[in-house]
Regions:
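Non-catalytic terminal accessory segments
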Residues: 1-186, 444, 450-451
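Soluble catalytic domains of enzymes that build or remodel membrane lipids, polysaccharides, and related
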Residues: 190-193, 197-450
């Protein structure tokens, strides 16, 4: 029997309350930082507007949690989600800037105090060296020194004014970034082709095209009409095989219809799926039932062998750990072993792992190709890579990767549960297999096809 904490509704409620509490901490830090940064320029109107903004976020966030827990219609849940997400993004984007501004202002104040102390010490001379009144003669001020002091004062004032101007523009910058990110997040998904070369690719698999959808998150921001458009766009790429690498739906009531639309692409080698963490989060039993009754097989710690001419393609699917922790490495090694169990050693192996961390276990076992998602590329990218790539080089956040003779592609996601993206568009990926040297870089290009 399912315990109360295993209920999807309870998990959604707990998750919503936890994220609201974290957001509340950021909101408090945001308000206090605004007060410090604006100091005397903190009029009642600005103070009222800031608190009203935080109140709007709090009310819509709690309302969204309640609406989800009570299964409220989308006509109510949608506006609450958009408003709470937009306001939270402004807070999250501006808080680091404002905290940095607080530190900068403290440094400026400490520097000014130190300079005042130095000047006071320089103006006080020892009494023993003080000349008699008769001998004291006022020397004219040096024009050069006077000019230098004025220049220093003006320079300090200019730097301070510039610094204050920059930090006080943080809220406007945050609103602009949030607006731009929300706008880009609501744009259509793009279709990218990625060519990868493998030295041992069987001739029968030369030019094989695998169409990958990942992290569609059907529900609040992605509806069935969008799924239909995505399926048509993918069909225009003429794939041989279609794979869904987890997090297909947040609203599991819509999952059967979505699977029917993806299966309607009718690739010659079929359509297959792997599990994601949101299937667990929303209700694994319900998700598995949809797959069992639908046209798309779910590969969950299992695999299938697909004959392609005189070659064989072994397609395997890993499980998802739900949460990453100290035991995650062992989990991925175990789930990949189970997925590969019984697979022919002479086949070309493709692993579907919702999380790209499964690639480390796959490459140590000699798998040629792993397809993953989950990260959404952090939803902010530059030059086809996540902006967090330098900080997390071993997390495989977005794009093609290679380790030894194994390759990985991590999708930026076909959908999202939060419609915010900058330089990291939603994508459908067509992976084309080529025979060639393993050290040849993957080639990625945009396909201009119409759905």
């Amino acid at each position: 029997m399912m315990s109360s904490m295993e209920s999807p509704e309870v998990r959604v409620l707990v998750f919503g309350l936890v994220t609201t509490a974290i957001g509340g901490a950021f909101a408090w830090l945001w308000i206090t930082s605004l007060r410090v940064v604006y100091a005397r320029a903190w009029p009642r109107g600005l103070r009222t507007a800031a608190w009203a903004f935080v109140a709007l976020w709090a009310l819509t966030s709690l309302g969204r949690v309640a609406a989800r827990a009570l299964s409220a219609p989308d006509v109510l849940y949608g506006p609450l989600t958009v408003t709470s997400t937009g306001t939270l993004l402004v807070v999250l984007l501006t808080t680091p800037l404002l905290v940095g501004a607080r530190l900068l202002l403290r440094w400026l104040e400490a520097r000014d105090r130190a300079r005042l102390v130095e000047r006071a010490a320089a103006d006080v001379e020892p009494a023993s060296r003080e000349p008699s009144p008769e001998a004291r003669v006022e020397a004219p001020a040096s024009p050069a020194r006077a000019s230098t002091e004025v220049t220093h004062e003006a320079s300090g004032f200019t730097r301070r004014a510039l610094a204050l101007g920059v930090v006080r523009s943080a809220p406007l910058a945050g609103v602009s970034a949030a607006t731009f990110g929300l706008g880009e997040g609501m744009t259509d998904a793009v279709l990218n082709e990625v060519e990868m070369q493998f030295p041992g690719l069987p001739p029968a698999l030369e030019g094989l095209r695998i169409l990958q959808y990942s992290d569609v998150h059907l529900g609040q921001f992605i509806d069935l009409r969008e799924i239909e458009r995505l399926a048509r766009l993918g069909e225009a790429a003429k794939p041989d095989l279609v794979v869904l690498t987890g997090d297909v739906a947040d609203d599991l009531d819509l999952l059967p219809d979505a699977l029917g639309l993806f299966a309607g692409i009718r690739p010659r080698l079929g359509t297959f799926a792997s599990i994601g963490n949101h299937e667990y989060f929303r209700g694994l039993h319900k998700a598995r039932r949809a797959y069992e009754r639908g046209p798309v097989p779910l590969l969950m710690e299992s695999g299938t062998v697909i004959p392609v001419g005189d070659a064989r393609l072994h397609l395997a699917g890993a499980d998802d750990p739900r949460f990453l922790g100290l035991q995650s490495r062992g989990f991925f090694e175990s789930t990949v072993d189970k997925a590969l169990d019984g697979g022919p050693s002479d086949a070309f192996h493709v692993l579907l792992s919702h999380r790209p961390e499964g690639f480390d276990a796959a490459r140590t076992r000699g798998l040629e190709l792993t397809l993953a998602g989950h990260t959404h590329g952090a939803q902010v990218g530059f030059a086809e890579r996540s902006v967090l790539e330098p900080l997390m080089p071993d997390r495989y956040l977005w794009g093609p990767y290679q380790q030894g003779g194994s390759r990985l592609y991590t999708s930026s996601g076909t959908g999202h549960w939060m419609p915010f993206r900058i330089g990291c568009p939603r994508e459908i990926v067509v992976l084309t297999l080529r025979r060639g040297p393993i050290d040849a870089p993957a080639v990625k290009r945009r396909l201009r096809l119409r759905a």
